[in-house]
């Protein structure tokens, strides 16, 4: 049996009791670690689970899934995913390949950012399409996701923005030379995402277009959702450029306007104090 | 401290390890039981948690929250919610009231139908606004949610339909006479939801309007998501009228059209066999 097990969002104890029981009895336990991170590392998980974990990076899962499936028809193998196995990233490719090999599978769900974002008080059923904001480079500055934000807002829907993660990336030179040397991991902060968004707003204005959002649009920054030191800050997009949310992972919500009174009241619990609004400007 | 703890979707062991530790040390533990149900009852939860649970029905939470908050500033109180505390139903009203009383709170997240629905293979970020389908009566047959389905489909988005639950409802006579006698609980099935949807489609046609969906629209019925005996069936809306999914809870997804190839492939794992498509017709 192949078990796909969600780990939730915080630390080792956010696994479900059912998930933990499976992890402890499986013959091999893989940890997917390229789409998200927990606030604790692999070692803390290993200690709490009492099991060695095999790191499954992108290459492993995409190219060498055969290793994962080995003997999974006669023994139990677990594949651990931060959040839910079908949350922000879907692992349906693994399930499809297992099914073709005649290996049965079971999913053990958990919280993912897709539902835990509700902790800021915005109602989940008022969220439209989720978007991803990637790190810009000097030559690659995609803006296409902005159309989705625009469409969501036109329909009065909030937009959850998932922020880029670069884990186990090679520099161009190392890639060309075939050297398996990896850059330090990078995680986009709410500040960076807000700055890129403001550039897009300005680009729209420069082209004479009315941007879908402005510096004053109400946003919510979230950091380490589900962890002990979770931080939530509600304020304008401009404020999101300088608000201090600490360590990764960060997410950003662009509200859809016309908030429900209960949504407004919840967001007021997280509003950025006036004194902070010019920090670092 | 007030703890809001998600129980997940299946049985007693779907609580997180962190949640279980909190439940076992709290002075009082409430179980919210009017917006959803687990496949196991209160007794099974009590046995596994080793704690007595106080059922918190709608009246209790809306009118007598003071009981829940009693001494929560000096001791720990847990409020258990099937799924996630901010999933299909938000409990932000409890948090706002606690905050006003100076009671700190903490949320322990879990899977909810809002993210676990991803197990059918449809990608979560392609879901638009979630709708609720309520039981029709002879005199109350609301169709207004259908506009949201239409808007979602126009944008290529899937629609998660949450199906009505009637728990602890009084008959009109008992309500008038002030008798606290409750009707047996009722849970809408995928069959019933599909039949109501088909009536709406026919009403639109009768008014000369083009309905947003037809008998042939691809839908997904889900039952007891996260439980051992979970069932998923993909087929036309017409097939959803007769597909056999067993006990509650049921949910229905109306696809947005233009499925991603990976979505199609996943749905094919759950397609209703031809031979079943005329069952009961």
Curated annotation (Swiss-Prot), chains A, B:
Enzymatic class: transferase
Enzyme Commission number, as recorded: 2.1.1.314
Protein name as it appears in the record: Diphthine methyl ester synthase
Top-level taxon of origin: Eukaryota
Function: S-adenosyl-L-methionine-dependent methyltransferase that catalyzes four methylations of the modified target histidine residue in translation elongation factor 2 (EF-2), to form an intermediate called diphthine methyl ester. The four successive methylation reactions represent the second step of diphthamide biosynthesis.
Keyword S-adenosyl-L-methionine: yes
GO molecular function: diphthine methyl ester synthase activity; diphthine synthase activity
Family named by the database record: Belongs to the diphthine synthase family.
GO biological process: methylation; protein histidyl modification to diphthamide
